[in-house]
Amino acid sequence: MATWLLIWETGYRVFGGEDSVGFPSPWSVIESFREGLFDGSFFSALAASLLRVGYGFGLALLIGVTLGLIIFSSRFGQWLLGPLVLGVQSLPSICWMPFAILWFGLNEKAILFIVLMGSVGSICIATRDGLTQVPNMYRRVAGTFGASKWQSLWWVFVPSAMPVFASGLKQGWSFAWRSLLAGELIKHVVGVGSQLDESRNNFEYPKMFATMFLIVIASVIVDKLVFGQFEKYVRSKWGN
């Protein structure tokens, strides 16, 4: 950590010191970060963003898993929805901003739509791939014991697909988080994305950098404490 601070401070002095534009010193960023923590602005912005992305990710999870099951269970669904989902997944979330504004206006629904479209494809593909990669031997054993299609799906396919699904879930979260940050640029709301853009517009570069660090820290914490632990649990129970 000290090495990175030294490199940063050296770069700050090389590029002009106090006269540099858009490249604040590490100490000014640390001070801005401290102020954001103590005045509560960082916590309120982060809480609003996490709540917002939670709604969008939950909706994406519901739709993505449903579409993944349809694609896996039906050849017609695979033919009709497979290429469409793959195409949606390949689009950067920022591409959905014009449609969100056109269809929903400048409001929370537009942000929710961007989060949904940014993450639903990843969850759908993870669901499909997890179910597809179940060994044929498991299918034959289930058939031998007389399991119905839905019994096989619930008791054989779903547990076997959980390790792949857990990895896809973590990836879907990362897409949802990045989509949220893009979506919060649409309208000035309480959130880390809007706070980042507001700092840029007001030339508050230390606060802008501090907000970026807040975003990174929050991303790492959620990834490690929530999805990392979930993935670890799934692999210990159903994986290898």
Model-derived features with residue positions:
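Periplasmic/extracellular loop-to-transmembrane helix junction in inner-membrane transport proteins
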Residues: 14-58
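Hydrophobic alpha-helical transmembrane segments of polytopic membrane proteins
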Residues: 192-230
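Loop-to-helix entry region at the N-terminal start of transmembrane alpha-helices
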Residues: 44, 48-52, 102-122, 161, ...
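Cytoplasmic-entry segments and transmembrane alpha-helices of multi-pass inner-membrane transporters
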Residues: 66-102, 125-132, 140
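Transmembrane alpha-helices
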Residues: 113-117, 149-183, 206-210, 214
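Hydrophobic positions within alpha-helical transmembrane segments of bacterial inner-membrane proteins
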Residues: 10, 53, 57-69, 73, ...
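Short cytoplasmic-facing helical segments at TM-TM junctions of multi-pass membrane proteins
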Residues: 126-168, 192
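Short cytosolic juxtamembrane segments of multi-pass membrane proteins
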Residues: 228-240
